[in-house]
A protein has these predicted regions:
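Short His-Asn-centered micro-motif
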Residues: 5-7, 33-34, 75-78, 99-100
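Short beta->alpha connector loops
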Residues: 8-12, 56-57, 77-81
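Short, conserved loop/helix-junction motifs that constitute active-site signature segments
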Residues: 22-25, 87-93
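Short N-terminal targeting/anchoring amphipathic segment
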Residues: 63-82, 94-98
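Acceptor-binding helix/loop patch of EC 2.4 sugar-transfer enzymes
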Residues: 101-109
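Short glycine-/acidic-enriched loop or helix-start segments at secondary-structure transitions
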Residues: 14-16, 83-87, 107-108
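N-terminal subdomain of nucleotide-sugar transferases
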Residues: 1-44, 70
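Conserved nucleotide-sugar phosphate-binding/catalytic loop shared by glycosyltransferases and other
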Residues: 31-32, 36-60, 64
């Protein structure tokens, strides 16, 4: 199983479909939502493998479960929540960061 950590970004709906097409039934997507807003502007995928949660909520911890059980942990945007999550991982966990243009432009230009 692959754990994907995502934010409400325009490219994520397409990304979810691509991963599920390439590796069906082997993906769990966490979409971080703003606790004040409780909904997304861009991602509207209604599938059992897509979860909309606030980081560190009880629901988040239950959905993620045992991090050592994942074949891959894939970061789709390096935000505050994903950084905090990475700091909690035990040694030896493989993490892949898929960088996209928005991250580069926002942080380095």
């Amino acid at each position: 199983m692959n754990l994907h950590l995502c934010y409400d970004e325009k490219v994520i709906t397409r990304t979810i479909h691509y991963f599920e097409e390439a590796i069906p039934n082997q993906n769990k997507f966490i979409i971080f939502v703003n606790p004040k807003k409780k909904s997304c502007d861009h991602v509207k995928v209604d599938k059992p493998y897509v979860h909309y949660v606030h980081y560190k909520s009880k629901e988040f911890l239950e959905i993620v479960g045992d991090v050592t059980s994942y074949k891959n942990i894939i970061i789709h945007y390096m935000g505050v929540e994903t950084c905090r999550f990475l700091l909690t991982l035990p040694k030896g966990i493989d993490v892949t960061w898929i960088i996209w243009g928005g991250i580069y432009i926002i942080n380095y230009w």
